[in-house]
């Protein structure tokens, strides 16, 4: 049974093998995380939390750029597209929580398709805008293919404009 702590991405009994790995990722201890990966290589793409997050999700949410960069080096393009229980990729997590351009650049450098993956009816640029991460939103907007934003392809273009207006992202900066 999922408890309150599960909703916050904490470990439950089904993923207890990953407890030390999770803690290392949370606190930014790459040496401990790397040691765990050396012993358990499958953990690079495993869902290690009750919310089905991978190591990359956890590191992105915690804001540890150096760990994100190291994990991305070891992951396949497909691994970067893994979604958590809420449908978020690690890029969407970065757009939601931290707004770090280096994380986004690292992930998109390995898999350009991440810019197109929809989470809760939003592409990453909209997730960043909606959470006030304007620098990241501008970066993601520049990488977002124009066809995704065209009216004939859905509401994404209108959503980007609406979020930009709402968040005053169209200013002089």
Residue ranges and their predicted role:
Residues 17, 52, 87, 121-122, ...:
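Start-of-repeat signature of ankyrin repeats
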Residues 37-43, 70-79, 105-114, 139-148:
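Ankyrin repeat domain, specifically the short helix-to-loop turn at the C-terminus of the second helix
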Residues 23, 58, 93-94, 127, ...:
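Ankyrin-repeat alpha-helix packing hotspot
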Residues 2-19, 27-86:
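Internal amphipathic alpha-helical repeat/solenoid segments
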Residues 47-49, 83, 117-118, 150-153:
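Ankyrin-repeat boundary/linker signal
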Residues 28, 63, 98-99, 132, ...:
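Ankyrin-repeat intra-repeat helix-capping/turn positions
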Residues 32, 66-67, 102-103, 135-136, ...:
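Conserved ankyrin/ankyrin-like repeat signature
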């Amino acid at each position: 049974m999922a408890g309150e702590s599960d909703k916050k991405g904490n470990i439950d009994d089904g993923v207890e093998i990953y407890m030390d790995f999770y803690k290392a990722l949370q606190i930014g201890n790459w040496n401990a995380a790397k040691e765990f990966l050396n012993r358990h290589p499958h953990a690079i793409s495993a869902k290690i939390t009750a919310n089905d997050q991978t190591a990359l999700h956890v590191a992105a949410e915690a804001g540890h750029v150096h760990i994100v960069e190291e994990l991305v080096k070891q992951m396949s393009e497909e691994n970067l597209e893994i979604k958590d229980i809420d449908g978020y990729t690690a890029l969407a997590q970065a757009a939601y929580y931290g707004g770090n351009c280096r994380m986004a650049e690292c992930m998109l450098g390995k898999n350009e398709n991440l810019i197109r993956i929809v989470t809760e009816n939003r592409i990453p640029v909209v997730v960043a805008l909606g959470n006030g991460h304007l620098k990241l939103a501008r970066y993601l907007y520049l990488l977002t293919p124009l066809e995704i934003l065209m009216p004939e392809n859905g509401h994404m273009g209108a959503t980007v404009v609406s979020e930009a207006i709402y968040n005053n992202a169209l200013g002089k900066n």
